[in-house]
Curated annotation (Swiss-Prot):
Region feature Disordered, mapped onto this chain: 1-22, 946-965
Record keywords, A-Z: Cytoplasm, Meiosis, Nucleus
Gene name of the encoded protein: Meioc
InterPro entries recorded: MEIOC (IPR027963)
Compositional bias ranges of the Polar residues kind: 949-965
GO biological process, one term: female meiosis I
Tissues expressed in: Expressed specifically in fetal ovary and postnatal and adult testes (at protein level). In adult testis expressed in spermatocytes, beginning in preleptotene and extending through most stages of meiotic prophase I, including leptotene, zygotene, and pachytene.
SUBUNIT field: Interacts with YTHDC2; binds transcripts that regulate the mitotic cell cycle inhibiting progression into metaphase, thereby allowing meiotic prophase to proceed normally. Interacts with RBM46.
Organism from which the protein derives: Mus musculus (Mouse)
Taxonomic placement: Eukaryota, Metazoa, Chordata, Craniata, Vertebrata
GO cellular component: cytoplasm; nucleus
Identification of the protein by name: Meiosis-specific coiled-coil domain-containing protein MEIOC
Length: 965
């Protein structure tokens, strides 16, 4: 409840001088404190319960205790009613507000709880001073409660709001620092700690009372520390508390392909890598009689590829594909939490199944889910049962089987959905024909490429057509087979590959435009002028210098340049096919050799959310698909692969739901040495090469298959963001671009890395921001107070200048060091100014004012001590190799101390305002206050201009400062 405008009891003061508390009466202060002492010391959940009661009291309109005492978020609370139901609990009765008996920071080893008699003496002293200075009743009501100011769950920012990009990983209304006894050193811990911090970080549902009093006296100090940091290990600013309840893990990951096999999973599966190595591939090859020889590191290749063996090849690769496809990141987001439940979920992820083989070899497809934007089916040969028996761990992420929705007759009519493994041409297709479907998983052309390509190898290119359909269903499409799945293929774009004089044509097909989908006209056609002057020049250069691009293997055996035919198909696809490409957003290159021991995601999952490779295109635009180049005869093999990578390797993007927001998460992409568009320049920047996407597709995880475990070259590894910043000041801007101009492309096209922080580090930065806000507000209010006193006491020198020694900053200070020095300086100035006020009013100020300032100084000393401990312990651990958990404990202790300093700074602001109201003469006119406000505003504006000029003149220091805490 806000203060009514007709209130005339409060003293006049400048507008905006104090945004904090202003009391009206203090008659009930003693009655309030008796119950408040039992309530304000509660920890997290109890405080949350209190805040809920507070909100209900405000809505019911009960009589306020503080009519003029406005908190920073302009709320007022009736505390007389809220404390009644909670104080009846016997377990809360023994809890005493530790802030009332604040012990010096140097004596934390002693028991800080004092007998209740001291509380009575403090009340008697306050009552005596109230009788002496009874003319200012409202001020004494405020001053009397300064030391007992509640620790509400409200932000301590000066404006009452917190920055949107700052997320706290633990509540703002946690118990005080003196309650965190586990953070203190061993000899300084009190014996009777009564609150366990397990409730802060445990993900289990326990009642509030049980959370508060789960303390076990038999726990060792190290176990208590582990409780404090449970849940902090995998947190950062972007992903917090994304774990599911433990009951969902067994539902999400059930091994149903083999009823006798049950897999064991991590408690939080998306943090840990659940992939298991393929241990049985070599055994399968030995059983099939294939001669093998060593190929690179941890790879096996065959000496010859016979046509009957292609069935085995497809079987092994499909088992790879099924396994890692089913191991997608389902548990990262709550809407994907129950993939095998029967109810339809609009945001549910695609359901992966084991494809059954019908009588004539036609694969069976899963049922379409309502509004599911991707569905997959895999062609699984009948003899893969042997593969399942040999390698059961590859099928440990299977999902339940569903009924087919496409009939055998319908399927047989479409050549695009058939699988040709070289056994026979059932539907009139050649064994080496790449048949495009509506997705990017099809047309995977396997090519064998050695460390130095052997031009004499007649089987340089072998194609294995792996077909898996990715269907898109919008809101209006029924569960039956949509009409846009009737694809007509045309053999109208032959692209010859030159292989030592022998040409093997892989026919690329253009799918006909959709007519049945209700969204078929909503998406513009893809620009077909992908290869224009720049790309033609690149081709010419590649023809003239074939050796310039064929030697950049970097000991990866050419695996980075293995591309599938769908990259060339991606250059020629029109509207609908590229719509599906933007839906599936996955590119798969088959691993080098069909018996690769790595996962398919290591070489093929390319999801580059790169703002430099994506340009938004209005939906009304259309392009003429007649300008596609027909032939690439003159390109050598390696050069052709490089061109494919340059044109189609990094063109995947993501679009948000509704507003076309591109996901800003940076993905690790495979650096294809110097052949990709990062090092050679993107040929599509000004060529109108756009990806198309729908506004209706929800945003998915950017890492569906996890990070690659192969140590591929990356821009993070090639050029570190901080390594060269001191030697070359403009190196980072040239390599990564400037964050302030996100639309401009950096010189070398590298994406600026995003630094992630742990939970305690994130909390430290949040508390720093809060405390800086309070410090700035205290500084402004101190200057405003000086102006008010100078205006109302002409001829008197009012200044906060003092000779108090302030420690100097180190040569390379962090933000914590700067904050400590600033707080010490401001606290000394406030103390000096309060001494001037006492001389001006010829009487001492309230005792709580000086006590609050003393506690402010103590909180600063605590932060200083925690900072020293962090530095010393970090240096010791660096020499001894202690685990990082100890480092996190120091950071957490520092963040807690800064939080307490923030509270003390806010109370110092309250005391400063109270002292000013007690000091100002009662004859101060409104006109004089207006003049003072104007003068103060001019002073503040002048100082802000000076700060802006200083900050703009030294941008590099600002950038370097953000990397520290």
């Amino acid at each position: 409840m806000e203060v009514s405008g007709g209130d005339t009891c409060r003293p006049r003061h400048p507008q905006g001088l104090r945004e904090g508390p202003e009391p009206k009466v203090a008659a009930a202060a003693a009655a309030f404190r008796g119950s408040a002492n039992r309530c304000w010391n509660l920890s997290v959940d109890t405080s949350n319960r209190l805040s809920d009661v507070f909100n209900s009291m405000m809505l019911t309109g009960s009589a306020p205790f503080y009519d003029c005492y406005k908190s920073q978020n302009e709320d007022n609370v009736d505390l007389r009613q809220t404390c009644t139901p909670l104080s009846s609990s016997t377990e809360y009765a023994s809890s005493i507000d530790s802030s009332l008996f604040y012990a010096p920071w140097s004596t934390y080893g002693d028991d800080i709880k004092q007998p209740p008699s001291s509380q009575i003496s403090v009340k008697n002293r306050i009552q005596t001073e109230r009788n002496d200075y009874g003319s200012e009743t409202d001020l004494y009501g405020l001053v009397s409660n300064i030391l007992e100011e509640q620790d509400k769950s409200q932000p301590y920012f000066a404006e009452g709001t917190c920055s949107s990009n700052l997320k706290s990983v633990w509540p703002m209304n946690t118990s005080r620092f003196v309650d965190h006894h586990d953070l203190l050193t061993e000899p300084k811990r009190p014996v009777d700690t009564s609150i366990s911090q397990q409730a802060f970080y445990s993900g289990e549902s326990v009642s509030a009372v049980e959370k508060q009093y789960l303390h076990n006296s038999s726990l060792t100090p190290q176990q208590k520390i582990d409780e404090l940091y449970h849940g902090y290990t995998g947190l950062d600013l972007e992903e917090q508390w994304l774990y599911l309840s433990r009951s969902d893990h067994s539902n999400c990951y059930n091994s149903q392909a083999n009823d006798t096999v049950k897999a064991t999973f991590q408690e939080y599966p998306f943090v840990k890598n659940c992939f298991t190595p393929q241990t049985g591939l070599s055994d399968i090859m030995k059983e099939s009689g294939i001669d093998t020889y060593a190929y690179g590191r941890e790879k096996i290749c065959t000496k010859g590829l016979e046509t009957p063996l292609q069935h085995k090849r497809a079987e092994i690769f499909l088992s790879q594909f099924n396994r890692y496809n089913e191991n997608a990141d389902y548990c990262r987001y709550p809407e994907y939490a129950h993939p095998n439940k029967a109810k339809l979920n609009k945001c549910s992820n695609f359901s992966v199944q084991d494809g059954k083989k019908l009588a004539n070899g036609t694969p069976e497809t899963p049922t379409v889910e309502a509004d599911a934007y991707t569905k997959l089916f895999q062609v699984k040969p009948a003899n893969q049962k042997k593969m399942e028996e040999t390698i059961p761990d590859q099928q440990n992420f299977a999902f339940p089987k569903t009924t087919p929705h496409l009939t055998e007759k319908q399927f047989a009519k479409e050549a695009a959905f058939t699988a040709d493994f070289g056994l026979k041409s059932e539907y009139g297709l050649k064994p080496h024909t790449a048949c495009p479907t509506n997705n990017d998983f099809a047309n995977v052309s396997e090519k064998q490429q050695f460390a130095k390509p052997d031009p004499l190898n007649s089987e340089y290119f072998k194609s294995v057509n792996l077909f898996s359909n990715s269907a898109t269903s919008s809101g209006g499409i029924s569960l039956n087979r949509p009409t846009w799945m009737n694809v007509q293929t045309k053999n109208n774009l032959p692209i010859p590959y030159r292989n030592q004089g022998n040409l093997m044509k892989l026919n690329s097909h253009l799918s006909a435009a959709s007519k049945g989908s209700n969204h078929s006209s909503d998406f513009p056609q893809l620009s077909s002028t992908n290869l224009t002057s720049n790309s033609n020049l690149f081709q010419k250069y590649c023809q003239e210098n074939p050796s310039a691009f064929s030697s950049f293997d970097f000991s990866y055996n050419g695996a980075e340049r293995i591309q599938s035919v769908n990259h060339m198909e991606g250059l020629t696809k029109t509207g609908e096919d590229n719509l599906f490409e933007s839906v599936t957003e996955k590119k798969i290159k088959q691993p080098n050799g069909f018996c690769d021991s790595y996962s398919a995601s290591q070489y093929g999952i390319i999801e580059n959310v790169n703002k430099h490779n994506f340009q938004a295109k209005p939906q009304s635009g259309h392009y003429d698909p007649e300008d596609i180049p027909k032939h690439f005869d003159g390109l050598p093999q390696n050069t052709y692969q490089d061109l494919l990578e340059s044109q189609g390797h990094f063109n995947s993007h993501r679009q948000g739901s509704g507003d076309n927001n591109i996901n800003s998460r940076v993905n690790r992409t495979q650096a294809s040495c110097f052949s990709n568009n990062y090092m050679m320049g993107d040929l599509r920047h000004n060529q109108g090469f756009q990806q198309l996407g729908s506004n209706g597709f929800p945003l998915r995880s950017t890492h569906p298959f996890g990070h690659s475990v192969v140590p591929l070259l990356d821009s993070y590894d090639l050029f570190s963001y901080d390594d060269l910043s001191h030697l070359y000041p403009y190196f980072n801007d040239m390599m990564y671009g400037d964050n302030s101009f996100s639309g401009f492309v950096p010189t070398f096209g590298f994406q600026r890395p995003i630094k992630t922080r742990s939970g305690p580090a994130s909390e430290l930065h949040i508390r720093l921001e809060e405390c800086y806000e309070q410090w700035r507000a205290l500084e402004k209010e101190r200057k405003k107070t000086e102006l008010a006193l100078a205006k109302n006491y002409p001829g008197k020198k009012v200044s906060s200048t003092n000779n108090t020694p302030i420690p100097r900053l180190t040569s390379n200070p962090s933000r914590v060091d700067r904050l400590i020095v600033d707080e010490l300086r401001e606290q000394a100035r406030v103390v000096t100014l309060l001494g001037k006020m006492e001389r001006l009013r010829s009487s001492p100020l309230h005792a709580n004012i000086s006590t609050a300032l003393d506690r402010h100084l103590e909180s600063i000393h605590i932060v200083q001590s925690r900072r020293k401990d962090e530095i010393v312990n970090a240096s010791n651990r660096q020499r001894q190799g202690v685990p990082r958990c100890q480092d996190d404990r120091d950071v957490f202790a520092l963040a807690t101390a800064i939080k307490e300093m923030c509270v003390a700074t806010r109370k110092a602001r309250t005391t400063l305002w109270c002292a000013l109201q007690m000091t100002l003469p009662k004859t101060a006119s409104t006109a004089g206050q207006a003049d003072m406000e104007k003068a103060f505003q001019d002073l503040v504006n002048c100082e802000e201009k000076v700060h802006e000029s200083i900050n703009s003149s030294n941008p590099m220091n600002q950038r370097g400062e953000t990397s520290k805490h």
